[in-house]
Structure formats: structure tokens, C-alpha cells
Regions:
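Bacterial extracytoplasmic/cell-wall-associated proteins, especially those involved in peptidoglycan
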Residues: 1-166
Length: 166
């Protein structure tokens, strides 16, 4: 397939295909292309932080929604806490069981070579432009999430269709 050829051309060892595709598919569902690298770094940082603030949980809406058979929107609070959804990265630490889509080569490249950074969080604060803010602390994330909430208060129809936050 095209994806397998891309992985081979990028010199990804076959034993890493599953992990790379899983990470890249999440990156692609979560953020616009210009933020792929930063989102890939967030995933790496969260996976590495098993004893820290995030406890190795990705906490990505896109994975929860995939497990529910949906894309776009925001999981309801009870959906985000449901342990029966194996793709619920709010509950289950580490990567979900598999990819949540077929990622682009750009998303794969971002996962293979994420930029340096201490980011643990991100939130898309403008759903029209895709503007996404990255942060290293839960306090910074709370301030950024307030920006999304302010945007949503003025753009209810847009926000009811979805939020991207990780």
C-alpha cells in the first residue's frame, strides 16, 4: 500500500510501523498540518511521563471519538470517563490499540522527527482558523482553554461541531 511504501522510504523499521501509524493518525486528527510537529512532541512527552502530571495518558478527544465510531465534536463527560472504550486515552495510559485513521506522510514525518519542546498540552482556540496553543503546565493549559471557551461563547454553532484539545 501507499502507506507501507512511505514507511519503507522513510526507513521506518517494520516492527515500528504500528506505533508510528498510531501516533501519526492521532496527530493528523488533532491539529492542522502546521502544528503536526508540536503535537507529535506532546504525544512523546506524555508517553514518557508515566509518573508525572499526565501519568502517561494522551487525553485526546480524537481517540475517544474514534472508539465511539465518531469523528469531530467533543466527547460527553461520561464518554471521556468510560473505561470500556479501549481508545479512551483519558482513562487508559499509553497509545490506543491502533491507528485512528490513515495518516499523511507529513504526519508520519512529524512523528519520526518531532521538534524539541516541553509541551504536555494543546488546545485549538479558534476553530475557524485552526489556531492552536501549546503549553507545558496545566495552569497554562487552563488559561488557553479559557480562550477556547471565550471563542465558543461567541461562536456556539461552530463549537457545537467540535473542539480539539489534548
Amino acid at each position: 500500500s501507499r502507506t507501507m511504501t512511505q514507511l519503507s522510504n522513510l526507513k521506518v523499521p517494520k516492527e515500528n510501523y504500528h506505533v508510528v501509524l498510531t501516533k501519526a493518525s492521532i496527530v493528523e486528527r488533532e491539529v492542522p498540518p502546521k502544528y503536526y510537529g508540536q503535537a507529535a512532541r506532546v504525544i512523546e512527552n506524555r508517553l514518557a511521563q508515566v509518573d508525572g502530571e499526565t501519568q502517561g495518558k494522551l487525553q485526546m478527544d480524537s481517540t475517544v471519538l474514534y472508539g465511539l465510531g465518531r469523528s469531530g465534536g467533543i466527547p460527553a463527560p461520561e464518554e471521556a470517563t468510560d473505561p470500556n472504550n479501549q481508545y479512551n486515552t483519558y482513562v487508559h495510559p499509553g497509545l490506543p490499540p491502533g491507528p485512528i485513521g490513515s495518516p499523511s506522510e507529513d504526519a508520519i514525518k512529524a512523528v519520526l522527527n518531532p521538534p524539541a519542546g516541553s509541551w504536555l498540552y494543546f488546545v485549538t482556540v479558534n476553530l475557524d482558523t485552526g489556531e492552536t496553543l501549546f503549553s507545558s503546565t496545566s495552569e497554562e493549559q487552563a488559561a488557553n482553554t479559557k480562550k477556547l471557551n471565550d471563542y465558543c461563547a461567541k461562536n456556539k454553532d461552530t463549537c457545537n461541531g467540535g473542539k480539539k484539545s489534548g
